[in-house]
């Protein structure tokens, strides 16, 4: 398998087809605005985001985690708030899709169809890895620019602190998946 990484420019996006974006090291909000704009401008374009767990949220790690925990538990009800809602995602792929959804006009047909054309995955799925030639795009404007005293955390770290059981289950599945991927690559 041949993996090529290229910078992605919104003016050079194809009008139709599929674009795979590697989210590793990107700031979540910046990448989400870029993707939302591309989905709205090109109605026949599908965007696949991989490595969503490596997206970055800037800010103090404790502050970000406490904000997520407060958002999850702030709805006080007499019965189970998880059944009633609002539903707050915990997994990185769902968190990112929710961020993009917030930037789309989800009540209109264009926004709903744009959201249907977005796929977000944690790590890279096997069906994408098995392609002969894989082009992963990066958005230079959305990459994290490291500077002194910059504080940030990844969505995976947030998920690990919010829901450690689900994170541990996913981590074990990734190890099994990695072994299968090595077998596919070698044989």
UniProtKB/Swiss-Prot annotation:
GO terms for molecular function: mRNA binding; structural constituent of ribosome. It comes from the Archaea. Pfam families: Ribosomal_L13. GO terms for biological process: negative regulation of translation; translation. Keywords: Ribonucleoprotein, Ribosomal protein. One of its GO terms (cellular component) is cytosolic large ribosomal subunit. This protein is one of the early assembly proteins of the 50S ribosomal subunit, although it is not seen to bind rRNA by itself. It is important during the early stages of 50S assembly. Belongs to the universal ribosomal protein uL13 family. This is Large ribosomal subunit protein uL13. The gene is rpl13.
